[in-house]
């Protein structure tokens, strides 16, 4: 199979010194991508031509950054990648906001604060938007208004990796992984646990040895995970 590059673009100033994973979102004829400084750009999928862009407001930080991972002056930048669902572009920020934008023109529909930094791209289904934050809390928001519908909290170990699992919604059930080594299935309607499965057991003498984070996206294949 011969593969050729049709087009390529750099989004804004890239990621800078930030340790974040920003996968783009794809919907219809749009590819939506973010940089590490609050810029979100929608490109034509076939030509690479910019269609619209949004720049999120900057927030002044006090104190010093840790190991240069954050700049002193940072926008509320997209921290978990770009999600697509319910006819919207869905992003979470380092300042604990979930923002819903119109796919066609990038206009903001709503934004809701969910607490801490959003660690993965939001997903949507059955009239709700689901988001997971770095404190291992899953929040369900009303897709029309952004109002909080329910939350689910998982007990975190003392030491974890930076990052979270990306929730996946399928047939009324939300699947996601947590820093305690468990994968959990939640009812999309109310957040009630259906089942949980430990995929790794913590072993070792130190907290570092005992890290068992599930940080990857859950993959579903028919009746298997």
Q: Where do the PLM segments sit?
A:
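Short loop/turn segments that connect beta-strands within beta-propeller blades
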Residues: 44-47, 102-105, 142-146, 187-191
